[in-house]
């Protein structure tokens, strides 16, 4: 999980989700997991 100021989709399979006021990216590829901090 990478904590970033700006999160973006890295590939086509990445999904942007809003969870508890935070934007997170989930993907089948674990390297693409991101969270806005």
Curated annotation (Swiss-Prot):
Q: Which organism is it from?
A: Acorus calamus (Sweet flag)
* Any Gene Ontology biological process: translation
The alphabetical list of record keywords is: Chloroplast, Plastid, Ribonucleoprotein, Ribosomal protein
Which Pfam family, an example, fits this chain? Answer: Ribosomal_L36
Q: Where in the cell is it found?
A: Plastid, Chloroplast
Instruction: Give the primary localization class.
Output: plastid
Tell me if tRNA-binding is a UniProt keyword of this record: no
Q: Which NCBIfam families match?
A: rpmJ_bact
Gene Ontology CC terms, in alphabetical order = chloroplast; ribonucleoprotein complex; ribosome
Question: Any keyword Plastid?
Answer: yes
What is the official name of this protein in its record?
A: Large ribosomal subunit protein bL36c
Name a GO molecular-function annotation.
structural constituent of ribosome
Under the heading InterPro entries, the entry gives: Ribosomal_bL36 (IPR000473), Ribosomal_bL36_sp (IPR035977)
Family of this protein = Belongs to the bacterial ribosomal protein bL36 family.
